[in-house]
């Protein structure tokens, strides 16, 4: 049986996959607003609790699982029945907005939903777990074996009916042609008399002087398993190199996560920006006792780039991706997942446009052997305590 766990369908996230890949301002405001997604952390938590409970059973009743993202049910549910085909009863899908058309019901990206393929004899067992976690659960379809994927309305009309091979067959290759634009920069020359000017420029960087931590006063110990949050020391300054969460309430093991990014360096050298981003994410985990050292760590790369905005920008992205790949291969660290937003350009009616600096944000995470042995980046108020500066750049300048 095909099962959906999570919230209702709304006119949200329509065409999100396409709009996120074009310049802001290219489409009408109505189209862009419909593509906006939502966030419902409570529903996400409920659905996650159900999935976790099923995974922790001795016999997992889940045959296949897929999250809802771009293209909504079309993408999510079709992935579940790719090998055999399936029929979805649209009358069983939860509708939060009665004015939705068939297309909007099928393709909206209202998130916090999971699609699952579950054996028929396990349906009632899964339903009890969903009721316990207060997660809405709907049996919306079944596998068919005819290698077609279809949505059928209550009146028998099928607004969507395609052969599976038409959906998952080999798509045509897209070739993008760009030219490498050589840019050269002189070594900066500093004058001690301009120290305050340099300091002002550095403090304008959001990554350096953002004051959100003063206003975002939220519960930083949700679930009670947060072993290290962003504020450290007596003054509670946001100095944490990494975040740490315990795996349970009694044990010592946990998970550490950190991030790294270097958009300023990437402006001058995209390859250096990628390497520095990975380096920052990894060095932020230096003082966390990883269970198996670097073998415990996996990375996620989020590419934020203004592709096709100007000549040479696509070539810069290629250079950055290749540099990150080569660097991680040399370190023998995997990058199993990631995300991209390749339309980081804002266009205005008068023809002006603003492009974002090409950036890769690297997230690192892995298992800790002991959450209590993570070293805090807080200086000891002791005159005899040495402070070392280790220069990883090896720059003689």
Region locations from a protein language model:
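Glycine/proline-enriched, intrinsically flexible loops and inter-domain linkers
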Residues: 1-397
């Amino acid at each position: 049986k095909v099962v959906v766990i999570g919230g209702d369908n709304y006119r949200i996230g329509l065409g999100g996959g396409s709009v996120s890949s074009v310049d802001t301002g290219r489409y009408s405001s109505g189209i862009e607003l419909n593509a906006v997604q939502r966030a419902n952390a409570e529903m996400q938590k409920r659905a996650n609790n159900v999935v976790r409970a099923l995974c922790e059973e001795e016999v997992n009743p889940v045959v296949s699982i897929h999250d809802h993202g771009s293209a909504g049910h079309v993408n999510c549910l079709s992935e579940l029945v790719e090998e055999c085909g399936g029929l979805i009863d649209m009358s069983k899908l939860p509708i939060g907005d009665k004015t939705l058309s068939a297309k909007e019901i099928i393709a909206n990206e209202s998130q916090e939903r999971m699609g699952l393929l579950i054996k028929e004899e396990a349906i009632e067992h899964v339903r009890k777990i969903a009721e316990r976690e207060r997660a809405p659960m709907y049996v919306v379809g079944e596998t068919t074996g005819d290698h077609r994927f279809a949505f059928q309305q209550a009146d028998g009309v099928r607004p969507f009916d395609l052969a599976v091979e038409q959906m998952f067959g080999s798509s045509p290759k897209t070739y993008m042609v760009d030219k490498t634009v050589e840019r050269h920069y002189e070594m900066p020359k500093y004058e001690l008399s301009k120290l305050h000017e340099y300091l002002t420029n550095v403090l304008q960087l959001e990554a350096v002087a953002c004051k959100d931590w003063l206003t975002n006063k939220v519960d930083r110990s949700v679930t009670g398993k947060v072993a290290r949050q962003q504020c450290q020391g007596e003054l509670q300054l946001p100095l944490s190199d990494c975040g740490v969460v315990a795996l349970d309430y009694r044990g010592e093991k946990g998970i550490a996560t950190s991030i790294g990014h270097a958009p300023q360096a990437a402006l001058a050298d995209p390859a250096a920006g990628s390497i520095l981003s990975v380096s920052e994410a990894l060095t932020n985990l230096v003082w966390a006792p990883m269970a198996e050292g670097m073998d415990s760590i996996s990375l996620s790369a989020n590419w934020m780039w203004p592709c096709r905005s100007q000549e040479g920008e696509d070539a810069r992205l290629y250079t950055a991706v290749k540099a990150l790949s080569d660097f991680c291969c040399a370190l023998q660290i995997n990058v199993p997942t990631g995300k991209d937003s390749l339309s980081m350009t804002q266009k205005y009616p008068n023809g002006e446009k603003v492009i974002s600096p090409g950036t890769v944000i690297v997230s690192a995470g892995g298992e800790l052997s002991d959450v209590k042995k993570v070293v805090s980046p807080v200086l000891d108020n002791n005159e005899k305590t040495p402070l070392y500066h280790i220069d990883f750049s090896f720059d003689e300048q």
